[in-house]
Amino acid sequence: MTKKMLDNLYKFSLEGKMTDIILEIEDDNSIITMNLHKNILAASCSYFDRLFNGNFLDSNTQKVKINVSNSLITKNIIKSFYGQENDVIDIPDWQYILEEIICKDYLGLDYDTSTLKDINVPSEYYDLLVYVAGIVGFNNPNITNLLTDLMPIDYDLTNISKDDIEFLLNRTGDCIFSLQGYESRYKTHRKYRLKILDSMTGNIIKTTNKYITKKFVYDFMNNEVICIDFDKNTSLIKCLKLSTNSEYEIKRSHNVENIILSNDGKILISYHIDKSETKFNSRRRSKEIAKSCLFKFFDVSDKKILFSFYIKEVVEKNTHIFNNHSDSEDDSPYCDELSKFYFEIKFMDISPDDKYLVCCFSTKFCLCLNIETKEVLWTTNLCNINNDNYYFNNSILSSSLYIVSLKDMIYVLDVSNGNTLKKIKKYNEGVYSFDDNVMMIYHSSKIEIYDWKNDKTIRTIKSTEKLLKHVYNPRTMTLYSSNNYDNIVSYKFNNFDIDTFTNRIISDDCDEFVFVNNYNKKIQDKLSDYLKTQNKTSEYDCVGSHINEID
């Protein structure tokens, strides 16, 4: 049927000409009456086809009443049968999308759930979202994220079945944050599109159309990604709210270099270097001079600064000053001023009890700050002045040990005083700790289980392919690594006595990835606690941990 014919039929409908059915569309607020054509209704909608061609109505019936969720939206749906545009309805977009699905489901029509993906439903209308989930299915990927991201913390879960609660619970907890990169407009830095994957199956939990940088942390208390972003000639901290896909900037966060989140999720710590000017030595080689270096401690709940701690003098006083071959610092008339390089931090770690902040600088100078007393507990230099190994792998901080992995050396420090307990001369690409005695040393195609106290290799486990970027989840003893095909591969360790290990690919093309323990933790705890009250066994409790990502 041509557009002109449909337009004429709708004109007849408005004028009440040559119509054979009066349809009354009723909701809780109004009744809309339309003069329509049975053949148009039956040909466009299975509900009306059954109504008119079944035994539900007398053949002489000229008026039918239907009760719907929203009469105005239903009128628009019927207008679409005639090829007409929608009337403008004074309700929010999210409400129109949800109620249109309800109305289309009532009429037996197909609906497009992709419109659900980015809507933001107010907490007082969460029941409406749950009702729509019952129509499209709780496992529909376009609504599942909304159910967990937008759930009010005080929501009555008795409105949701236990099976659906268990399904939603599986969408929280252990996750892989997979990053796919692209060059920024001016190619000054690289940004990534975030995709959240289930750590066991690799199934996509959530995607976002926003871009973040590699330097980020996940705020599990507020379900936000906090990252270092770039604006003109400065760097700053931005937050991406995963529930609404919206961004905002943290005030007083400029010239930021590093960020880390406390294990309890309450404090965000950032490190800032303010550059004063660029100076030149007698050979006209430039040197960026740092004006000040400081840590800022933010309250995660309101993003306000709790206190700041300046460390420029501490670094200048305790770090080794060295010559860099032909470009000698002594050749500069400003040799008493250290370049920005001396103040750059490679790793920032917080102890499990959130009491200590330990940092490793580019010069392999280490500093431990007591967060409670706001005092420097200890400083140390890992290498002598002439050591030129600048290839950093990763660091680990436990309650008793601080471990730093360089390309050809692993340092084990006593976290209470900074004393070096062990220097392990091994070429490696990273190290993870099983406990205070045993560590996992990572090589390109093998893993060495090593007892560092007794200087003994317990087991060497060979891999079938080269292992690239990697993170380790100590709670489940699972290692995640990327391979040559940009896929994430997981390795499950049963014990130390195995000769080989099996792998299972989490199929996803990625440039970078990070393991996250407590994705959407508040909702995770709420769902888990509810299931426990229903006499169900829950195994979803998570223990947070922090491991620096390997470059």
From Swiss-Prot:
SUPFAM superfamilies: POZ domain, Quinoprotein alcohol dehydrogenase-like. Residues 19-90 form the BTB domain. CDD domains: BTB_POZ_ZBTB_KLHL-like. Pfam families: BTB. InterPro entries: BTB/POZ_dom, Quinoprotein_ADH-like_sf, SKP1/BTB/POZ_sf, WD40/YVTN_repeat-like_dom_sf. Belongs to the mimivirus BTB/WD family. This is Putative BTB/POZ domain-containing protein L76. It comes from Acanthamoeba polyphaga mimivirus (APMV).
